[in-house]
Amino acid sequence: MNTTDTIVAQATPPGRGGVGILRVSGPKAAQVAEVVLGKLPKPRYADYLPFRDVDGQILDQGIAIYFPGPNSFTGEDVLELQGHGGPVILDLLLKRILTLSGVRIANPGEFSERAFLNDKLDLAQAEAIADLIDASSEQAARSAMNSLQGAFSTQVHQMVEALTHLRIYVEAAIDFPDEEIDFLSDGKIEAKLDEVIVELERVRSQARQGSLLREGMKVVIAGRPNAGKSSLLNALAGREAAIVTDIAGTTRDVLREHIHIDGMPLHIIDTAGLREASDEVERIGIERAWQEIEQADRVLFMVDSTTTNAVEPVEIWPEFMARLPKSLPITVVRNKTDMTDEETSIAEVSGYSLIRLSARSGEGIDLLRDHLKETMGFSSNTEGGFLARRRHLQALNTAAEHLQQGHEQLVVARSGELLAEELRLAQQALSEITGEFTSDDLLGRIFSSFCIGK
């Protein structure tokens, strides 16, 4: 990426709208203002001005705001042109700006990337911008804003700072081995290390909640034909998302619904009934069902309670259980309690959760919702929380592993050198979250997923 270029892009969504915004950032932002507006607006004041073409004809009239660097979003000179949101008008204005030498269309996320490179925000905050735009619930939006304001980054910086001081202490013990006090055995280093480990575990717990808010949980409903899978999908979705009939095999393909349970995104997938296929279409549907099952976070094993009294999954359908990945969590759902003597309930059977409900009447659905929240460790009370991505969780987990290994080196091996190395690696892992230690390749992948105008 050439950061000496001046970049321009539409900051509002494509299509028609009341207002359309073009954003310019770079050393020629002031020149763009001079040629398009005929003047350089007073910094940080809104000016209502005509936007002119190369020949001086007025293309549009609107608001122009000039932010000289470094006091701007990107840290560079920034010009925003807010005109009417017609695609033709905005395209003409964009072409006019691009006639200037040294001005080009921005790459996806390049405005945010320049803000990061100019220390206007760290990497976790930059990612929070995209997460705020993509938020699918009020809770996710609030958590993304907390991240943007530094709720996550501040905690990471504090842990990095604590590790820095700890490393200084440890390396002093290594450099001055003849001191009267044995730094490695007097308990001070271990106490400080334990404090960081406890704090890291607290942040990891928050990050897991933030990851659930951002990415949600993939739940696949699977079972034999006519077990009530589509009825359960409709009950969870709160609408008639799937066709329901008494004919076995009504669902031939994968159906997806995205809902929220107290703020937790849930990706529910209804699948074709699993049996020996009667035709090619059904065979393909069953193959797709198994593909979804193998990629699920949890499987709801639907059982028609009018056909069996069994509650053990292996007893209900041994072939199904044999094919499931061993590490895949399942919940057995005995459906159609409205047609049997069973009461709606939840219990544990041989290590599996068993829920009795009626998808048709809705009895027991709240039990299932609470169960899904509990199994994912989701708490709806996340005030002050932040959003987290998979890479954040991976970095936190890596840091935790190095701190545990460092603790062993301190307590068991009494090796200052090995402890110092584990602390360094933990610090490096945490620094990857905020971008203090990050490869160019990772930066490219992160910012390329952003909107063009961000």
Swiss-Prot record:
Required cofactor(s): K(+)
Binding site for GTP: 226-231, 245-251, 270-273, 358-360
Stored CDD domains: trmE, TrmE_N
Source species, domain of life: Bacteria
Annotated (6S)-5-formyl-5,6,7,8-tetrahydrofolate binding sites: R23, E80, K120, K454
Domain TrmE-type G: start-end pairs: 216-377
Biological role: Exhibits a very high intrinsic GTPase hydrolysis rate. Involved in the addition of a carboxymethylaminomethyl (cmnm) group at the wobble position (U34) of certain tRNAs, forming tRNA-cmnm(5)s(2)U34.
Name of the protein: tRNA modification GTPase MnmE
Gene responsible for this protein: mnmE
